[in-house]
């Protein structure tokens, strides 16, 4: 995509009775894309977590399939929540979740803690280790009571690298 292009996007309302195991991608969205959709997509949530999800074509419709149920569980999606998907033009979607109160929510946050070893010498060239652990959703609410600005324990994590489109074969796309 050219740098001035607007990234393709769509939205949906989550309903567990139809979207817990797979999510139908609107035909009006994918029919107008300049490229075919990949068979595997990378979903990046607002909390920094990343999910690999299979895209499946069935009866001339495209779904987010295998792996979608992990996204649903990790983000504790509830009926009536609004999801937006912004496609990078290759394989990745940035997914935002809007709760029933119409506000964007941060879920499935990646929690980073620095682990120091007391026995390490100050001259140790390896430095300290970092533990990256997902935080449970109830610990990462956007509650502003008390205005606790301790942002040092939660950080954005760069999404995992995705192979370039030029490296993909035609069988990787619909």
Curated annotation (Swiss-Prot):
SMART domains named among the record's database cross-references: B3
InterPro entries named among the record's database cross-references: B3_DNA-bd, DNA-bd_pseudobarrel_sf, Plant_B3_domain
GO molecular function, one term: DNA binding
GO CC entries: nucleus
Biased composition (Acidic residues): 139-150, 164-174
Chain residue ranges for the region called Disordered: 114-174
Keyword tags: DNA-binding, Nucleus, Transcription, Transcription regulation
Protein's UniProt keywords contain Transcription: yes
DNA-binding region: 8-101
Record-linked Gene3D superfamilies: DNA-binding pseudobarrel domain (2.40.330.10)
Cell membrane among keywords: no
Superkingdom of origin: Eukaryota
Compartment annotation: Nucleus
Listed name of the protein: B3 domain-containing protein At3g06220
Organism for this UniProt entry: Arabidopsis thaliana
């Amino acid at each position: 995509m050219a740098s001035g292009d607007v990234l393709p996007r769509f939205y949906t309302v989550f309903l567990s009775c139809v979207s817990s195991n797979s999510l139908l991608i609107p035909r009006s969205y994918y029919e107008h894309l300049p490229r075919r959709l990949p068979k595997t997509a990378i979903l990046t949530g607002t909390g920094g977590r990343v999910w690999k999800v299979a895209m499946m074509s069935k009866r001339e419709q495209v779904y987010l399939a295998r792996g979608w149920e992990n996204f649903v569980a990790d983000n504790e999606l509830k009926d009536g929540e609004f999801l937006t998907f912004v496609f990078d033009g290759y394989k990745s979607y940035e997914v935002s979740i809007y709760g029933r109160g119409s506000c964007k929510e941060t879920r499935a946050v990646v929690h980073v803690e620095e682990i120091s070893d007391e026995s390490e010498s100050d001259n140790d060239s390896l430095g300290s280790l970092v533990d990256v652990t997902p935080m449970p959703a109830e610990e990462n609410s956007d509650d502003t009571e008390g205005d606790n600005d301790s942002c040092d324990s939660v950080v954005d994590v760069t999404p995992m690298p995705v192979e370039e489109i030029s490296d993909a074969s035609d069988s990787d796309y619909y």
